[in-house]
Amino acid sequence: MSSSIFEMTIDHDGMDSTGLKLSQTASSISMGDEFLCSSTTSNSILDSPLPKVTFNHIDSITDINTNIMNEIVEPQSGVDVDVADKNVLYCIDPYPVEPPCYDFANPSKVIRYPIYEHCRPCLTSVKPPSYTPSVEHYTVVSMKMEKLSPFENASSRLWNNFILQINSTQINFYSIDDSLTRHIKNYRGGDMFDHSHHSKTASDRHHSARSLLNAFTTKSTYQFDKYDKERICGEIARDEHKFLSDERLFKSYSLQCAKVGLPIDYSSRDFVLRMRCEGQQFLVQFSHVDELIYWAMYLNMGISLSLDLELREMPTYRSVPRRRHPRARRFKQHNKNKNKNKSRQNSDRNDSRSHSLLLRRSHTSSVVTKVATGNERPTNKSRSRSLSLLPPSVSDASHDSNGPNDSGSLAGESSQTDFCGLFTSKLRNFFKTDSSSRKNSNMDIGQKMRSKELNSVQEEIDDNGSTTNTNTSVLSSTFSPTAHSVLTAQTSIHENFRSRSNSNPIDPLRCDRSVLKINNFEPVYEGTGRSTISNSAERTNREEKLNRGNEDVNGDEDDDEDEDDANYEEDDEDGYVEDDDINRLVYLDERESRYENADVEYGTIFSTKSFSVTGCLNHDFPKKLSLKCGNKNQSSNDSKWAPATQLVSRKRYIKDSLRCIKPLTEDHPWVGKIIFKPALPPAFETNNPPIRVYSGEDSTDLMHVKNHYLKPYIVGSCGFLKTGSKLFHFYDRTNDLTNL
């Protein structure tokens, strides 16, 4: 549409201007003419002519009559406004509007939108997919009730065995069927675990009093181990409807506003978690440390999913393990350095004492051997396994190989015998550990042998395998190089233990590196005249170098652990887990893994033809050294641009996992927290009715009912308070709740 510029001119030179003149760039028209507007798309906007206006002589534009201006502005009554609006819209978009094509609406072929043009309506017979829980697992546990409510302690604090199941947002405890425990001799699942109790719900107090009385007269509850758990869970997986039926339900808890954590104040049993559900507090014991870590994760997932979306908070998981307190850490590091300095001073003092003691022992043993007959065998029960396997002719052959018996040869041989006897006791003390707190009094002999210390495994081999190994082809009636290498290796190992016994106690988790590398001994053959111990000075220097290398390796390992701990974020908001508790669980896991492989390892070692003490000791600890010393021989460029993957040891994995679990003590505050209590269902019918197991409609114990209804309360100082929906956002903040 063409636009024109209008300007109003007035002639003051004596000319009578009888009208306003409109000047245009290309042409000019007068006000009296008809105002027409041409366009390429429409004929005209205003078809009616404008009114003609005559002016007298005016001095300024302000003298114009306002009525005349209103007449110019206001349109005539005959003009249709709707028609004019339609014409304007038609000028803007004359063509009909249609939806664009998908190619123009989405030019990018990467983004794809679903097209439902050819969809058919769903039939009424088609059902939606079945429900699948977010978290679903089960295992065998032992449970101990601590509190029936925040204001009432449990009358019966006995352990009872159950099948624990987590079904998304609730946990269920089922009684264990007798067919699952028939392989366990004298099994006892606890006094509360009684099938007759399911039919008599009115005698709860009498039952708890009777259970407290029977605690002093009956046997302890059986504690499941890893093998029992795997076998029982395998049988449950074959028939879940039978073993996880509603008739076997003992209790059902909702995970809404529940809490779970490590009971750092409880040390009677291992692998235990403390839980708070529906106002009750109880302990749950698992079979091993891996199961404890997994179930802590499962329970936290269920707690995060339990509340509604509008009431749910962002979960605060501990994905980074917390370090211990800096004050306690500095104190521990100071004592560690202090003990290192003392051990170094004591080692220098004891070197001379050990040397003189060895000389006195050798002289005394030489006098004793002169009195004893040559064919008499020692009957001491504490002699080494290797010497007991040798026939009597071995000792005679050792005398004859060096000519006539003199005091020096007798002293050397008696010192070897004494060394080997002491080596056996040292080796047994090396693997000896504290008595386990998880002993079962009603276990059979095979299970007791497997669950005791490693020394019991060795004694069992002594009793059963001594007669069979003496007839093997390894130990002949004559003196053999293999037997002599055994004696030589035992003598060297004993000297190393003897020199370090007073200064540095042996740690069962860290083997001495000098013990691991005893592969350079040369066997002495008959008639060669070589000494049984080759050049003691060179061997002493080699052992000192290996000992220094072992100290460096252990120091590097401690430094690596300290550096890892220094990178941990310190957070004391919810407390921290004591290192003693974590180290205790780690130690139990390492001991249990050692028991699992004890029968296989020692059974195969002592039955092979190339038996040696070196192979026996090298079997348990090569992986630890290879992880620490593997990257030192690589070039700098390879380690910089293609670094080797750092394998996390199992000990570090367990420590980090346990530090990520928040602690929960028995006296953790209840006041100000929101809990859910079981409530009666509404009067109207719902689509999710509660599942009653064995109780009648008049039962008051709603925890024996699946899908029972809940009602929120605030724990006060003297009782429960009613709560509203606003408080759910602050259910974990005590100060905000108490100030409302």
Swiss-Prot record:
Coiled-coil positions: none
Annotated region (Disordered), positions in chain: 318-414, 525-576
Superkingdom per UniProt: Eukaryota
One cellular-component annotation, GO: mitochondrion
Compositional bias (Acidic residues): 553-576
Ranges of Polar residues composition bias in the record: 400-414, 529-538
Basic and acidic residues biased stretches: 345-354, 539-551
Bias kind Basic residues: ranges: 320-343
Family: To yeast YHR131c.
Protein name (Swiss-Prot/TrEMBL): Uncharacterized protein YNL144C
UniProt organism field: Saccharomyces cerevisiae (strain ATCC 204508 / S288c)
